[in-house]
Amino acid sequence: MNFYNIFVFVALILAITIGQSEAGWLKKIGKKIERVGQHTRDATIQGLGVAQQAPNVAATARG
């Protein structure tokens, strides 16, 4: 029973220590994912602008 308590305590300390040291690595991945999301958003906005202008171009071409 005493071994179990010591094991849980050591595991908890290890988890806290590793979690704090790995935050930089996780933050870098989060920033990359956020950047991809921003690029996707910007491309979608540009695509919608082109799609909204297409009917005007078609109407102008018909006369």
Curated annotation (Swiss-Prot):
Pfam families documented for this protein: Cecropin (PF00272)
PROSITE patterns: CECROPIN
InterPro entries tied to this protein: Cecropin, Cecropin_insect
A single Gene Ontology CC term: extracellular region
Signal peptide: 1-19
Any single biological process term in GO: innate immune response
Record's keyword terms, sorted: Amidation, Antibiotic, Antimicrobial, Immunity, Innate immunity, Secreted, Signal
Localization of this protein: Secreted
Record protein name field: Cecropin-A1
